[in-house]
Curated annotation (Swiss-Prot):
NCBIfam families membership: glyS
Assigned keywords, A-Z: Aminoacyl-tRNA synthetase, ATP-binding, Cytoplasm, Ligase, Nucleotide-binding, Protein biosynthesis
Name the UniProt record assigns to this protein: Glycine--tRNA ligase beta subunit
Compartment list: Cytoplasm
HAMAP family linked: Gly_tRNA_synth_beta
Catalytic activity, EC: 6.1.1.14
Keyword Nucleotide-binding part of the UniProt annotation: yes
Pfam families from the UniProt entry: DALR_1, tRNA_synt_2f
Main location: cytoplasm
Amino acid sequence: MSEKTFLVEIGTEELPPKALRSLAESFAANFTAELDNAGLAHGTVQWFAAPRRLALKVANLAEAQPDREIEKRGPAIAQAFDAEGKPSKAAEGWARGCGITVDQAERLTTDKGEWLLYRAHVKGESTEALLPNMVATSLAKLPIPKLMRWGASDVHFVRPVHTVTLLLGDKVIPATILGIQSDRVIRGHRFMGEPEFAIDNADQYPEILRERGKVIADYEERKAKIKADAEEAARKIGGNADLSESLLEEVASLVEWPVVLTAKFEEKFLAVPSEALVYTMKGDQKYFPVYANDGKLLPNFIFVANIESKDQQQIISGNEKVVRPRLADAEFFFNTDRKKRLEDNLPRLQTVLFQLQLGTLRDKTDRIQALAGWIAEQIGADVNHATRAGLLSKCDLMTNMVFEFTDTQGVMGMHYARHDGEAEDVAVALNEQYQPRFAGDDLPSNPVACALAIADKMDTLAGIFGIGQHPKGDKDPFALRRAALGVLRIIVEKNLNLDLQTLTEEAVRLYGDKLTNANVVDDVIDFMLGRFRAWYQDEGYTVDTIQAVLARRPTRPADFDARMKAVSHFRTLEAAAALAAANKRVSNILAKSDEVLSDRVNASTLKEPEEIKLAMQVVVLRDKLEPYFAEGRYQDALVELAELREPVDAFFDKVMVMVDDKELRINRLTMLEKLRELFLRVADISLLQ
């Protein structure tokens, strides 16, 4: 069967840059699934994406589905005909479904009986006939949150569509896709190359688009070119470009023919904190800042034009003129804000609502101040500095700089605090209170910052849960999942001696009578333990290991982490599987018994050598392991408990627990309870699979 290259290109108006990659990847995945479901043999499915087009190129696509043999078994002969040999209704219905009469059916004979049989040779449908619907279906399944409608048509897509190219080899596949009749005409760059031209064969794509249309359709190629050219441009001026992955992706999605250029701004603007300058360069203008080798911002930036110009200096000057007013605004705001102390913004916090039922930002500040001081006392941080940081924590939200450049919250608080002469750990805490901002982000660097970061997040968790507005489904408007995980990461990775129980109780207490949820403390703790589950699963821990620890509901995060590591190590021991099974057996035996057990094992009642040996070892280990449990040495404790495998196995092999003698039975049940209690000091080992 012959094979050809297939091309589909959807020419549009400018597509959303942040969604371009996902649209193209989904298009390719959807179309590949359509090909596979149709049984069409094919080679590589390559996707292309540029601001005004989505395209797929399929190598070695079969020209038709393979022919196939089908068999449909009908009713058994005994049910297919009546006593007179006439077809039954069941047989006639089956035959109609197959498109034949009962007389035309074959018969299938096996050792189990005889049935009616329909056998047919089905010729594979041509690829040409299948492609239009496959393309339309693939486009309809794209992850587009908001569709557009244009003109007088009722067609919907992410952006208006102007061209549809469907080529199988050199042949146009006739179709109407998204309201546009397919053709071999594609459009080039808006301002360079040929505005539109015909493509003769699918194999010519994307080279013909580059040569005649001045468009680099390959997304990864454009991105790599921007990265390489920007690095070279930065090197030429003795610096390093800030080529963050997210901005690289966005810029690659904004240009069809990237031309990297270098521009500059006045050095006087470097007196403004670099974070504000970088915010406007990256966030507003999509420029790449340039840093010197010592990490200081240089008065230069790199940008990407979408056109080759005979006068590049004109483009450079134009971009310099665009960014200058934004930098001048930042300079003005910075100088204006410093005319008063950060603390002077406190009264204005009373005018901003945190949440209708929970009060203003000033109310939140008072709670954070108190909670940060309480946390600092628990973890051995400077209480005065922590309460001072709490007092100033939201003051920068009232500054001109943060009002205009919102992403500079925190960092501007740090700069203004330094200007006011605040202690360095207080200033740093104002910036780091929002850390970690995302997965993998840095944690607060000093104890005061840790106290403030935990206080801010716990106040939000307690408040929102306290009024019954916990996250539901994918909706989490107050970012409570991120807040909970942030608190856990700080406590675990900084090994802080904090208990979620007392921490949550203190956060709730500071709200006074504002909260309406009577179960708020338990709800917050359960929610945070649930975040633990997600965290450790991401870290590669098995679900049953997590469940074994969660069963004990340890509320000290650092302690929880130690238990997780201990159980994970225990699983590697040879005795683990047998002891997990034994714990499960003990758990079941104890669950079925409703008898009141003794406080201790009565050694004089024990009879069998196996139970005597096990009872002695349980007593010895109980005394030996008490310091281990007190010090959180759970891994060492489980290693010691692993030595119980042989006596436990011997006990269950030789000793009957549920004997008629009540005193003996209760004694044996008590011993098993004491055995299980030792393991439960770490985790519920019976849950391990």
